[in-house]
Swiss-Prot record:
GO terms for molecular function: ligase activity; phosphopantetheine binding. Belongs to the NRP synthetase family. The gene is pchE. It catalyses: holo-[peptidyl-carrier protein] + L-cysteine + ATP = L-cysteinyl-[peptidyl-carrier protein] + AMP + diphosphate. Induction: Expression of the pchEF operon is strictly dependent on the PchR regulator and is induced by extracellular pyochelin, the end product of the pathway. Repressed by Fur and iron. NCBIfam families: AA-adenyl-dom (TIGR01733). Pathway: Siderophore biosynthesis; Antifungal biosynthesis. This is Pyochelin synthetase PchE. The modification O-(pantetheine 4'-phosphoryl)serine is found at residues 46, 1385. The lineage of its organism: Bacteria, Pseudomonadati, Pseudomonadota, Gammaproteobacteria, Pseudomonadales. SMART domains: PKS_PP. Disruption phenotype: Deletion of the gene completely abolishes the formation of both Dha and pyochelin and results in salicylate accumulation. PROSITE patterns: AMP_BINDING (PS00455), CARRIER (PS50075), PHOSPHOPANTETHEINE (PS00012). Keywords: Antibiotic biosynthesis, Ligase, Phosphopantetheine, Phosphoprotein, Repeat. Modular protein that contains an aryl carrier protein (ArCP) domain which bears a phosphopantetheinyl arm to attach the activated salicylic acid, a condensation/cyclization domain involved in the cyclization of the cysteine, an adenylation domain which activates the cysteine residue into an aminoacyl-AMP ester and a peptidyl carrier protein (PCP1) domain which bears a phosphopantetheinyl arm to attach the activated cysteine.
Length: 1438
């Protein structure tokens, strides 16, 4: 009948009829409900409410689910319907009956996910969506049980379904049995139990043979003593949870009284799917629009702590945690839920989400919620066994501090919103997110199966008893929450993947979950729903943070002046050849203090110290403190604009420099003048709480921020380290850290204050590892304190050149420490030398934590922070300032006695970063970290180093750790690259092979008589003409040329003709060289153009000389000729040998020889590419970055006079070593002495002298680079050396394979490059910004390379069309991955079906996962096609 909206009575009658039907309650009881009774408290759950909404829609209503759920009572619904149009009677539509039930039909979207997910190539695949149930009973009749199983199978088509190629088909009689019997009654009890455990482990994780129609298996094991163990193995491709209950019920009836079974259901699942798709088409379109609009704002999966990458688990196994709420607890919880107008499922779901939020790095995440939706107008649907599941994406945004009542209502609103748009299910939403480059995942499931009846139906319990145990698995699912009614209570069960989470984590979370629910049974829901930190974790942290301070409050400089008075003749500073005693240093400091006081400096003033490294710098610092002021260290190379910013921000009153300028702002005082003034009698008395120094660090806004640290704060840290190290007067400490880096605070006041001597490198030795090594050996340095990169530089020197055996302690801080560094350090130092890795922040007085390292345990991903130092404390907090549980990542906060006063003259920033709460004062570091279960702190990088790429949260430190964990990688730096779509890139430093043993023997030099004199004649001829020409010459260049002419005037030289003859030149060549130089000097071309000139490029000149020609010829002879069918890959470093590239390289183009040219200058590379044959590949080294695909790829590397182009020759050698495959060879030609002709052109480029190789040193450098050298040939001026590479074992394939084992796909860098070493900033830390800019530039150039879109072969083009049809986008790159272009498992299935249709070739999903690129799949397809043709030919012959 039609229902007019103004007929409230008729509408109410109709609504109550529907509710009575949906709830299974008597109509009279439902009609007795008041209009304002909350129907959710009367048993109306989300599923039934959805069914009601669909019945309303069938009558023309436009009310959506959210409107009905907002006020779930009859009165509110009648008000809503009163505003609507007339509700018409729906057309009676029975589900169609299939005409041919033997034909395959499509999978539902959930079935597709389960089917594809079980594939071995999927993440957490290799497992089916499966349930295993165990029951313990007695006296079961095996024959009757087997008959019951077969009876039920025949009644339900989906229990006879087979699954092939992404489709399903009903079999009349599957070939495999559905019953298994094991009779172990004669076994010993312990033997039977062992066998049962093995059988249970197997069956609980088995993949049934669904491709042969085996979707369930019922088993009976007859145990000793008369017990029977009944088990059921069910693949959930064929049945949802309600179907499982139906299966159990029918098994019970079929066993006890098969005659009581009703007629088998006539409805076919294929009919239901077709009808449902048509019925929901309009709703699906609306839901799709809803989800697409929300996509950019959707959160991701819960960021739970993981023990490993999910991809690394190849054979997932699950384990169950379970707890049963008692009948009383269940009733109380149900009553409270009804009072608050929420469903019981929402209560459990909200509690689950609160626990996830507590253990997740983010409180915003997605849950996967199965909706068991078997509603249809045809009542027969309730009798059908099949999988009617729809998956919903539920957005959880859990807020701290809100009551549970508020939290659960918010959770339910979100759930109802998801249900309202269920017609576009979770799988489609996630697929769209991937297509749009914003991938999300939802691997945590919340499933509620709280029906009115128990999970195990009475019909089954009567026959076999209640459930004893259960276990389930679902592909790609990390954690599956399940709820069931059992007995009089509710069973809570979590199934999680074994090994995916850290040990003990699921148990701790589950304990918190159960505890929360039990509190909710009895406590007021108006209280905040915050979960407390587990008590054991609270106690452990209190103990670690409660260590008393070691310090006695005093000023930083007090101890030094006391020691100077006690032993004035003891060494304080060792600098170059100088020795400065304590007394001398104290006197200089007091003189400087006197001068400052005379200039008006008063306690608390800020005085800048901007001096080169050395004794005067140290004296100035102590002088400033002795005057009562605080020092502000500024590097002498500080940019003027930044210097002015700092001086103004700090309120600097005076600056101690190397110049006098009283009129400057602030005034500059010359340190030498201060040293000539009268000295103070003693330091000005100061309170320990006074400011000691202000160190400026970079600010995120671009404005430097000055950290103001008191004497007491710094001395607390220093005393903790002095107590640990037992520093004494016999120690000598190498002060490599800059004054404006706070590690220098310990050097100055810890070292000198404890009586040790400081060994000071000079300013020009700030980055000279060789100078440090010499100082360590010379002065028997015992203590090292630096950033890790500086120690890496020191260890890069061969042991023969760097003896560090005097070191007894090494302190490292300020950056990541490579995991292998302790192992490399140990054999280079004194026996018993301890490595201490420290961390913290400038804002917390140098350091706040310590980890002493002997050996590195295999489970460490990086060197951890360790424990807080005495007098200091650490917290790991979430975004609301709550302490997070162990293993959960949060922001590190530092407290205790070493905290800075704040930021100098910036109270607003100080208030933001230094916060107070009930536990005290804390500095918010902006660093990410976590506590381990034993109380160890782990540092995980900066908060701003956690980045998002295509929607995925990525911790750059984890990417770097994964790279560094691979053999052959020394260090790494990852970054997000700009330039269009953001992507992830990384630079790695290959580890050099151990020092190689080559031959240091030198062959006799081949004589080339008279070459030097001949060159001198030609040089004089050219220079004379140029100096006489009307050219404007640079004064320095003119002077150098005149000096050379004067030096060569006394030499006896041959005639011009004789000189030309000796060199094998024509006069035209001399003219060409002179004209080229004249053009450059006249400004017709830029000086850099000479590098392209065939006459002036230094390498080109060398190649034109007789000994150069001979060296080149011998080099080419040393290249082997590839055998037929083989390839020889040759890399050439540097394009600056212009002439020989044009001629010599062309001669290298033999069959089988592949030539690649590497060059750091784009201009030179482009010019070379234009000149050279197309067969020669050119590769740019933008900013020196070598693309990782070239690692370990080449059989030979050629370097023709190219080493001088590098800042240090070892960089060029490291590049060559990285390019060579194992047993590859470097062929190197280098100049041993100056060539006047070559210097003609070089002088225009650079006024620095050309670096020339000394042959013994060159051979030693090669050996140090891990290349075994052998000199093949030499003249007096040039040498040819061959060096054998043992090989790094590092190549692109090995890198990718290693990353696949350690990182999920979204975290793997799309581009990898390598460098000989990572660039450092002024503080000795890795210069991340510079590297990110370099990688972005290199990526931009790569994207514009002509080869980026290569023409496709015909067979590739045909395959690309199949890709395009599925992906709905152009496909042009043969190496592009199907998945990087937006593909997923479902689209892969469609693609393989399209390939089968077009090419007649059947490819398996595993084949596709092995070759997911266009080129790889095309090759595989060709092989398959050939095999099919050969098979067909063979059959035709037979």
């Amino acid at each position: 009948m039609d229902l007019p909206p103004d007929s409230r009575t008729a509408l109410r009658d109709w609504l109550t009829e529907q509710l009575a039907d949906l709830l299974g309650e008597p109509l009279a009881d439902v009609r007795a409900l008041a209009d304002d009774d909350d129907l959710l408290g009367c048993g109306l759950d989300s599923i039934r409410l959805m069914y009601l909404q669909e019945r309303l829609r069938a009558r023309g209503s436009t009310l959506d689910f959210a409107q009905l759920a907002q006020r779930p009572c009859l009165g509110a619904w009648l008000d809503l319907l009163a505003c609507a149009d007339r509700l018409s009677a729906p057309a009676t539509v029975a589900l169609p009956t299939a005409q041919d039930r033997d034909q395959p039909f499509e999978l539902s979207s959930v079935q597709q996910a389960y089917w594809l997910g079980r594939g071995a190539g999927e993440v957490l695949g290799n497992v089916s969506c499966h349930a295993f149930l165990e029951f313990r009973t007695r006296d079961v009749d095996p024959q009757r049980l087997a008959a019951a199983a077969e009876c039920v199978r025949q009644r339900h088509p989906m229990l006879r379904a087979r699954f092939l190629d992404g489709r399903q088909q009903i079999l009349p009689t599957p070939p495999l049995s559905c019953f298994d019997l094991q009779d172990w009654r004669t076994l010993q009890v312990d033997e039977a139990e062992r066998d049962w455990q093995a059988l249970r482990d197997w069956r609980a994780h088995e993949c049934l043979a669904v491709e042969r129609g085996q979707v369930f298996l019922l088993g009976l094991v007859r145990m000793p003593g008369g017990e029977d163990r009944l088990w059921l193995s069910l693949d959930l491709l064929a049945a949802d949870v309600e179907s499982l209950r139906l299966l159990l019920a029918e098994l019970g009836v079929a066993y006890l009284a098969p005659e009581r079974l009703a007629e088998p259901p006539a409805l076919h699942f294929a009919d239901y799917l077709a009808h449902r798709a048509a019925q929901r088409a309009e709703a699906a379109a609306r839901a799709r629009d809803y989800w697409l609009e929300r996509l950019p704002r959707l959160p991701d999966a819960p960021a739970l702590p993981l023990a490993c990458a999910p991809e690394s688990i190849r054979q997932p196994r699950t384990r169950r945690l379970a707890f049963q709420l008692s009948a009383g607890e269940s009733r109380r919880l149900e009553r409270l839920a009804a009072q608050h107008g929420v469903t019981l499922s929402s209560v459990f779901g909200c509690a689950f989400a609160l626990v996830l939020a507590r253990w997740s790095e983010s409180a915003e995440f997605l849950l996967n919620v199965p909706l068991f939706d078997r509603h249809a107008d045809d009542p027969r649907i309730g009798e059908v066994i099949a999988d009617f599941t729809t998956l919903l994406l539920l957005e959880c945004r859990m807020q701290a501090g809100v009551s549970f009542a508020e939290a659960v209502k918010s959770f339910q609103r979100n759930l109802h919103g998801a249900i309202d748009h269920a017609a576009f299910p979770a799988l489609e939403v996630l697929r769209e997110a991937r297509r749009q480059g914003q991938p999300r995942s939802a691997p945590v499931v919340f499933a509620s199966n709280l029906g009115e009846e128990g999970f195990v139906p009475a019909a089954f319990r009567d026959a076999f008893g209640d459930l004893h145990d259960m276990l389930s698995q679902t592909p790609q699912v990390w954690l599956d929450h399940q709820l069931y009614r059992v007995g009089d209570g509710i069973l809570l069960a979590w199934d999680s993947v074994v090994g995916l989470f850290p040990e003990g984590l699921p148990e701790t979370m589950f304990e918190a979950y159960v505890g929360l629910l039990q509190r909710l049974c009895d406590s007021a829901w108006g209280q905040p729903a915050d979960l407390p930190l587990p008590w054991a974790q609270q106690a452990r942290r209190a103990l670690l943070n409660g260590q008393p301070a070691c310090a006695t409050a005093r000023t930083l400089h007090r101890d030094f002046f006391l020691r100077a008075a006690e032993a004035p003749d003891a060494d304080a500073l060792l600098y170059r050849d100088q020795r400065v005693t304590r007394g001398e240093l104290a006197e200089r400091a007091l003189r400087i203090a006197g001068g400052l006081r005379e200039a008006g400096v008063r306690p608390g003033d800020a005085v800048e110290v901007s001096l080169p490294r050395g004794p005067q710098q140290v004296a100035a610092v102590f002088g400033v403190l002795a005057a009562g002021a605080c020092y502000v260290p500024l590097d002498i190379d500080q940019p003027p604009a930044r210097r002015r910013l700092i001086e103004e921000a700090a309120g600097v009153c005076l600056a101690i420099t190397e110049e006098d300028d009283p009129q400057a702002l602030p005034p500059r005082l010359d340190v030498q003048r201060l040293l000539r003034g009268p000295a103070l009698a003693a330091p000005v008395p100061l309170a320990p709480q006074a400011s000691a120094y202000v160190i400026y660090t970079s600010g995120s806004t671009g404005v430097p921020k000055g950290v103001e640290v008191s004497h007491a704060a710094a001395i607390n840290t220093i005393d903790a380290l002095l107590d640990l190290l037992r520093v004494n007067a016999s120690d000598r400490l190498l002060a490599v850290s800059a004054l404006d880096f706070d590690l220098s605070v310990f050097d100055l006041f810890g070292g000198l204050g404890a009586g040790a001597s400081l060994v000071l490198p000079a300013q020009e030795q700030a980055r000279d590892a060789a100078a440090w090594a010499e100082a360590i050996q010379r002065h028997a340095v015992s203590l090292w304190n630096s950033a890790p990169a500086l120690l890496e530089m020191a260890l890069s020197l061969p042991a023969s050149q760097a003896d560090y055996r005097s070191l007894r302690a090494v302190l490292l801080s300020g950056d990541w420490v490579a995991l292998d560094l302790p192992g490399r350090l140990r054999p280079r130092c004194a026996e018993g030398c301890r490595l201490h890795v420290l961390g913290g922040a400038t804002e917390a007085g140098i350091w706040s934590n310590l980890q002493s390292v002997d050996t590195v345990p295999p489970h460490w991903r990086s060197i951890p922070y360790g424990r807080p130092l005495p007098g200091q404390a650490y917290r790991v907090v979430d975004t609301h300032g709550r302490d997070v549980p162990d293993l959960v990542v949060g922001e590190l906060w530092i407290g205790g006695a070493s905290l800075a006063r704040g930021y100098r003259n910036d109270p607003e920033l100080s208030a933001r970063r230094f916060v107070h709460d009930a536990q005290g004062r804390w500095y918010r570091t902006g660093d990410r970290g976590r506590y381990w279960g034993d109380g160890t702190l782990e540092f995980l990088g900066r908060v701003d180093q956690q980045v998002k790429v295509r929607g995925q949260r990525i911790e750059l430190g984890e990417v770097e750790a994964a790279l560094c964990a691979q053999a052959g990688v020394e260090s790494a730096c990852a970054a997000v690259l700009g330039g269009g779509v953001a992507s992830l890139g990384a630079v790695l430093v290959p580890r050099l092979a151990p020092r190689a043993e080559g031959s240091m023997d030198l062959p006799a030099a081949q004589p080339f008589a008279g070459l030097a004199e001949a060159e001198a004649v030609l040089t004089r001829e050219i220079l004379g003409a140029l100096l006489e020409a009307p050219l404007e010459l640079d004064d320095g260049l003119r002077r150098r040329w005149l000096d050379w002419l004067a030096d060569s005037a006394a030499s006896a030289l041959p005639s011009l003709d004789e000189a030309l003859r000796r060199l094998g030149w024509q006069a035209a060549g001399l003219t060409a060289m002179g004209n080229a130089l004249r053009g450059l000097l006249a400004g017709e071309q830029a000086p850099a153009a000479l590098l392209l000139d065939p006459w002036l490029a230094p390498q080109a000149v060398a190649a034109r000389l007789p000994d150069g020609r001979e060296a080149l010829a011998r080099l080419l002879e040393a290249l082997p000729t590839p055998a037929a069918g083989e390839r020889l890959r040759v890399a050439v470093l540097d394009t600056r040998a212009g002439l020989w590239l044009d001629q010599g390289m062309a001669s290298l183009l033999r069959p089988g020889l592949e030539l690649t040219l590497f060059e750091r200058s784009r201009v030179l590379l482009d010019a070379a590419a234009t000149r050279l044959p197309e067969r020669i590949v050119v590769q740019a080294l933008d900013d020196g970055l070598l693309p990782a695909e070239h690692l370990g790829r080449y059989d030979r590397v050629i370097s023709f006079a190219a080493l001088h182009a590098y800042e240090a020759s070892r960089e060029g050698l490291a590049l060559a070593a990285a390019l060579l495959r194992p047993q590859g060879r470097l062929l190197l030609v280098d100049l041993l002495c100056e060539s006047p002709l070559a210097l003609l052109g070089a002088a225009l480029l650079d006024d620095r002298p050309l670096r020339l190789a000394e042959l013994p040193s060159l051979l030693a450098d090669l050996a140090a680079a891990g290349l075994a050298p052998r000199c093949l040939w030499r003249s007096e001026r040039i040498a040819l050396v061959e060096a054998l590479a043992p090989g790094l074992g590092l190549d692109a394939a090995a890198l990718q394979a290693g990353l696949e084992q350690r990182l999920p796909q979204a975290m793997r860098p799309e581009r990898l490059w390598c460098l000989p070493s990572l660039p450092l900033n002024g503080n000795g830390k890795v210069d991340r910004r510079r590297l990110a800019e370099s990688m972005t530039r290199a990526l931009g150039e790569c994207r514009h390379e002509p080869s980026a879109e290569e023409p496709l072969e015909a067979h590739e083009q045909a395959l690309a069309e199949c890709w395009e049809a599925v992906l709905k986008r152009p496909v042009r790159r043969r190496e592009a991955s199907f998945f990087s272009l937006g593909g997923d498992s479902l689209l892969a299935t469609r693609l393989l079906a399209g390939i089968r249709e077009r090419f007649g070739v059947r490819l398996g999903m595993a084949d596709f996962y092995r070759q997911p690129t266009l080129a790889g799949l095309a090759r595989h397809l060709q092989v398959q096609t050939v095999e099919i043709e050969e098979t067909q030919l063979e059959e035709g012959v037979l």
